[in-house]
UniProtKB/Swiss-Prot annotation:
Function in brief: Synthesizes alpha-1,4-glucan chains using ADP-glucose.
Primary gene name: glgA
GO molecular function terms listed in the Swiss-Prot or TrEMBL record: alpha-1,4-glucan glucosyltransferase (ADP-glucose donor) activity; alpha-1,4-glucan glucosyltransferase (UDP-glucose donor) activity
Reaction catalysis annotation: [(1->4)-alpha-D-glucosyl](n) + ADP-alpha-D-glucose = [(1->4)-alpha-D-glucosyl](n+1) + ADP + H(+)
Domain of life: Bacteria
Full protein name: Glycogen synthase
Length: 477
């Protein structure tokens, strides 16, 4: 079984979000599971530099200009690169310029990614041809459409990491991307009078997966579907929509081997976590005190992530004696709000604006509770890292958060399945009640330790996801 992943980023070569973590880990897990998985990426500067053994496979003139297809390896995974400097050789973000404006030629930059993905199924590399083209998010969404236009030389799977990003472009670009105008249709890639790369993936793929079972159900409902509910309800009825939970890359995220921690630990040596907490308190300008619970946020600061709720609930958290360490960037209003809180409550609130992968490990190793109060969350990796590190997740019951965290209710504690704190409603009062439950459990150290051990024993390895995808691919053949 030969599978080509088509996507725009891959950790650690290039990362703007959780998609990169998935592509950095899933193909390697699939190879270990007996699937010949490779990855197709645009040759953005950081990616091109990272794949040092890239050799020329093919050269083509395309609707988006001349391209060179390269093939090399990274961490044991075969990587195809679309080398087109006029499209991809730009500093900074792969999606927008330094003023945060989307590049005006994104329609060509990402149509080309989908086109090359489909061409791979028609022999662009004469020595390797995928049985399944596995496409991720809107950037690669045209690949199933190009496959359909080609008579479907391979099966296709489209994975939705976040339905909110739809890849919308003006209709006149149908003239530029080498797809039949007949595809610009409600039964096709047309959405609200525009081309939607996301809808192309959803409509033309043989199967759609979402990154958690709950998110797969949620996206058939209007409040989560951004207008795609009709199509997604139809795919659900046809048995062509399912959820496969993301995993954790244990080579990178494991408190036992994590060299970024001051003190490594296991579920049997949890007392060694205390050193990480005091180091984190020092680094964040917090009062060093192992008796108070340290709550943490590692997140984009947006209302999707529910960070406005954290700001609203913060006085209540601090009144009970808690501390907050926050790492993130995003909405300027939220940034200002958290910086003001840090100034108002020195020693209790520490804020670092920005994102540093290494520091996120130190927070995960040192905090007691990780807050993930998202309004929607397709899968969420942060809470999985929290479980792995015995940093109990406090989450809203939505998407992947609902699938991965069990509340510390009395019955869950009795059944030995409790692993964190879960609240229902997207408001500060509901969040504060969950924070209150965290304080109650914190006052029972032996019970807290019991829940930490439960959390750390859970298996969210990529091997589980790799097996689910393999079974799906064979069903499609």
């Amino acid at each position: 079984m030969q599978v080509l992943h088509v996507c725009s980023e891959m950790f650690p070569l290039l990362k703007t979000g959780g998609l990169a973590d998935v592509i950095g880990a899933l193909p390697a897990a699939q190879i270990a599971d007996g699937v010949d998985a490779r990855v197709l990426l645009p040759a953005f500067p950081d990616i091109r530099r990272g794949v040092t053994d890239a050799q020329v496979v093919s050269r083509r003139d395309t609707f988006a200009g001349h391209i060179t297809l390269l093939f090399g390896h990274y961490n044991g995974v075969g990587i195809y690169l679309i080398d087109a400097p006029h499209l991809y050789d730009r500093p900074g973000s792969p999606y927008h310029d330094t003023n945060l404006f989307a590049y005006t030629d994104n329609v060509l930059r990402f149509a080309l990614l989908g086109w090359v993905g489909a061409e791979m199924a028609s022999g662009l590399d004469p020595f390797w041809r995928p049985d399944v083209v596995h496409v991720h998010d809107w950037h690669a969404g045209l690949a199933p459409a190009y496959l359909a236009a080609r008579g479907r030389p391979a099966k296709s799977v489209f994975t939705v990491h976040n339905l909110a990003y739809q890849g919308m472009f003006y209709a006149h670009h149908m003239n530029d991307i080498q797809l039949p105008w007949s595809f610009f249709n409600i039964h096709g890639l047309e959405f609200n009078g525009q081309i939607s790369f996301l809808k192309a993936g959803l409509y033309y793929a043989d199967h759609i997966t979402a990154v958690s079972p709950t998110y797969a159900r949620e996206i058939t409902e209007p409040q989560f579907a951004y207008g795609m509910e009709g199509l997604l309800q139809q795919r659900h009825r046809e048995g062509r929509l399912s959820g496969v939970l993301n995993g954790v890359d244990e080579k990178i995220w494991s408190p036992e081997t994590d060299l970024l921690l001051a003190s490594r630990y296991t579920r049997d040596t949890l007392e060694d976590k205390a050193e990480n907490k005091s180091q984190l308190q020092i680094a964040m300008g917090l009062k060093v005190d192992d008796k108070v619970p340290l709550f943490a946020v590692v997140s984009r600061l947006t209302s999707q992530k529910g960070l406005d709720l954290v700001l609203e609930a913060l006085p209540g958290l601090l009144e009970q004696g808690g501390q907050l360490a926050l790492l993130g960037a995003g909405d300027p209003v939220l940034q200002e709000g958290f910086l003001a809180a840090a100034a108002e409550y020195p020693g209790q609130v520490g804020v670092q604006i920005g994102y540093h992968e290494a520091f996120s490990h130190r927070i995960m190793g040192g905090a007691d509770v990780i807050l993930v109060p998202s309004r929607f969350e397709p899968c969420g990796l942060t809470q999985l890292y929290g479980l792995k590190y015995g940093t109990l997740p406090l989450v809203r019951r939505t998407g992947g958060l609902a699938d991965t965290v069990s509340d510390c209710s009395l019955e869950n504690l009795a059944d030995g399945v409790a692993s964190g704190f879960v609240f229902e409603d997207s408001n500060a009062w509901s969040l504060l009640r969950a924070i209150r439950r965290a304080f109650v459990l914190w006052s029972r150290p032996s019970l807290w330790r019991f829940v930490q051990r439960q959390a750390m024993a859970m298996d969210f390895s990529w091997q589980v996801a790799a097996k689910s995808y393999r079974e799906l691919y064979y069903r499609l053949k």
